[in-house]
């Protein structure tokens, strides 16, 4: 039995039945990382000794017949912008190279409380800015289905770790699609929760009104398990909602009779690969055959979402990243003439091209002469997009669309084509701008590459997403696929 190919709920079953030890599971994953990660590039840091130590502690509890917790003995990878005490937290940037976190993020605390085994920190686009993980300052992450293709981004390492069987579960962050798009490209399940459902405390900020931590797993049940473990109010993050977190496992039923699903025409227009369209339309038919009521709908302002997103996120990034200046935080240049030179050279040496591009754009739209024309107007557009979604959700329980207009593209194909790269998030960005939840799960294969189905629902209706996603998943076998790597 290959332990690395099992889901979290399968591992929980054999652990609780004492068919395997937590240490055995952990060592299997560490061996797998040592075997394949030089080619896949999922990890930036591996915490081997600590992982084995924690696994041994869980084995002692099992021997004493103590009750296991939600994640006991389950190997988890953490994106390298989420703090884990004693581990590096570089955001895949040279400016934070060598930084070790002195504390745990709230989500990390929750994973540790539920006895998940944290294997290490995962590769990403620098400061979560990118859609391919090609912007990592340290190494490329490769798609396990085809090593010549990208895994998506910015949580590319998080997707590769799960798809490449280097972790059972992982955490990513989603600002404009950074959990859902790599989940789609790598053939796994990824959730962007409602803004405020999961704490951002201890997560290095990119766009503070957009960032959300998102769970990733091999199937819907795994994703629901991790969401239940980390969701909820955090008094250290005033943007978290004081709303009870349901037991998402109860949502995992095959009953979707009467659920109303909207199909927005704006998500099926020009630019969508025809084979992707066909795969998504076939998935919609499955949901309809299983009892859902499917009707067309319209979100007419979606064409403006991408522009609003890049204005708002870049403005917030320029503000958030101002602290990395060589004085307060981050790399300090060794060759400087005066104080101004420290700032200039430290940031020039420390940040990559994409981060510099977005800082400059953000600074521009926040400047006195352009604030009203760009940033203020983008906030107004955002409000209208939110209203658009609310209007649709008066008539529908969920909306279904492709996650990405294409399957995974080749490494280097879009690296120098900024607009083409940005357009790869065209179906995920509107959801982030509105702050509503969405899940991506596999719905097909095209030329050996996975296709992602995106299901979107109203605020704090993650249970609806899990219900519909689970129903579809149980009707097909795409979630059982494993990259032959």
Curated annotation (Swiss-Prot):
<feature type="active site" description="Charge relay system">
    <location>
        <position position="79"/>
    </location>
</feature>
<feature type="active site" description="Charge relay system">
    <location>
        <position position="154"/>
    </location>
</feature>
<dbReference type="InterPro" id="IPR020556">
    <property type="entry name" value="Amidase_CS"/>
</dbReference>
<feature type="active site" description="Acyl-ester intermediate">
    <location>
        <position position="178"/>
    </location>
</feature>
<comment type="similarity">
    <text>Belongs to the amidase family. GatA subfamily.</text>
</comment>
<keyword id="KW-0436">Ligase</keyword>
<dbReference type="Pfam" id="PF01425">
    <property type="entry name" value="Amidase"/>
</dbReference>
<dbReference type="GO" id="GO:0005524">
    <property type="term" value="F:ATP binding"/>
</dbReference>
<comment type="function">
    <text>Allows the formation of correctly charged Gln-tRNA(Gln) through the transamidation of misacylated Glu-tRNA(Gln) in organisms which lack glutaminyl-tRNA synthetase. The reaction takes place in the presence of glutamine and ATP through an activated gamma-phospho-Glu-tRNA(Gln).</text>
</comment>
<dbReference type="InterPro" id="IPR036928">
    <property type="entry name" value="AS_sf"/>
</dbReference>
<keyword id="KW-0067">ATP-binding</keyword>
<dbReference type="InterPro" id="IPR000120">
    <property type="entry name" value="Amidase"/>
</dbReference>
<dbReference type="InterPro" id="IPR004412">
    <property type="entry name" value="GatA"/>
</dbReference>
<keyword id="KW-0547">Nucleotide-binding</keyword>
<dbReference type="GO" id="GO:0006412">
    <property type="term" value="P:translation"/>
</dbReference>
<keyword id="KW-0648">Protein biosynthesis</keyword>
<dbReference type="InterPro" id="IPR023631">
    <property type="entry name" value="Amidase_dom"/>
</dbReference>
<dbReference type="GO" id="GO:0050567">
    <property type="term" value="F:glutaminyl-tRNA synthase (glutamine-hydrolyzing) activity"/>
</dbReference>
<dbReference type="GO" id="GO:0030956">
    <property type="term" value="C:glutamyl-tRNA(Gln) amidotransferase complex"/>
</dbReference>
<protein>
    <recommendedName>
        <fullName>Glutamyl-tRNA(Gln) amidotransferase subunit A</fullName>
        <ecNumber>6.3.5.7</ecNumber>
    </recommendedName>
</protein>
<comment type="subunit">
    <text>Heterotrimer of A, B and C subunits.</text>
</comment>
């Amino acid at each position: 039995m290959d332990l690395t190919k099992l889901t979290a709920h399968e591992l929980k079953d054999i652990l609780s039945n004492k068919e395997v030890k937590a240490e055995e599971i952990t060592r299997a994953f560490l061996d797998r990382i040592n075997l394949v990660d030089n080619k896949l590039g999922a990890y930036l840091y591996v915490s081997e000794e600590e992982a084995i130590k924690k696994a041994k502690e869980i084995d002692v509890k099992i021997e004493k017949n103590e009750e296991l917790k939600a994640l006991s003995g389950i190997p988890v990878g953490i994106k390298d912008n989420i703090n884990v005490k004693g581990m590096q937290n570089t955001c895949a940037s040279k400016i934070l190279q060598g930084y070790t976190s002195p504390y745990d993020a709230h989500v990390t605390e929750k994973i540790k409380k539920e006895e998940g085994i944290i294997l290490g920190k995962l590769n990403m686009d620098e400061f979560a800015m990118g859609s391919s993980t090609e912007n990592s300052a340290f190494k490329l992450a490769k798609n396990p289905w085809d090593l010549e293709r990208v895994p998506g981004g910015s949580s590319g390492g998080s997707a590769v770790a799960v798809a490449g069987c280097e972790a059972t579960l992982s955490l990513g962050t989603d600002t404009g699609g950074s959990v859902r798009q790599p989940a789609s490209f790598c053939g796994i399940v990824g959730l962007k929760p409602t803004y405020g459902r999961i704490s951002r405390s201890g997560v290095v900020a990119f766009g503070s009104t957009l960032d959300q931590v998102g769970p990733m797993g091999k199937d819907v049940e795994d994703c629901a398990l991790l969401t239940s473990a980390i969701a909820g109010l955090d008094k250290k993050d005033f943007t978290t909602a004081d709303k009870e977190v349901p037991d998402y496992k109860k949502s995992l039923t095959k009953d979707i009779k009467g659920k109303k699903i909207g199909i927005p025409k704006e998500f099926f227009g020009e630019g969508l690969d025809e084979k992707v369209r066909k795969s998504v339309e076939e998935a919609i038919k499955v949901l309809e055959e299983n009892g859902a009521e499917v009707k067309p709908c319209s979100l007419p302002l979606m064409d403006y979402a991408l522009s609003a997103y890049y204005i708002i996120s870049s403005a917030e990034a320029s503000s958030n990243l101002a602290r990395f200046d060589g004085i307060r935080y981050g790399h300090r240049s060794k060759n400087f003439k005066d104080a101004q030179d420290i700032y200039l050279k430290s940031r020039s040496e420390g940040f990559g091209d994409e981060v510099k591009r977005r800082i400059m754009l953000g600074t521009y739209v926040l400047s006195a002469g352009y604030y009203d024309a760009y940033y203020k107007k983008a906030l107004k557009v955002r409000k209208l997009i939110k209203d658009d979604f609310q209007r649709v959700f008066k008539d529908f329980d969920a909306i279904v669309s492709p996650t990405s207009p294409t399957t995974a593209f080749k490494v280097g194909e879009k690296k120098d084509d900024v607009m083409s790269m940005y357009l790869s998030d065209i179906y995920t960005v509107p959801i982030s701008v509105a702050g509503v939840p969405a899940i991506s799960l596999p719905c097909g294969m095209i030329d050996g590459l996975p296709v992602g189905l995106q299901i979107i629902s109203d605020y704090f209706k993650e249970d609806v997403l899990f219900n519909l996603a689970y129903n579809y998943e149980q009707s097909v076998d795409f979630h059982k696929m494993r990259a032959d790597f």
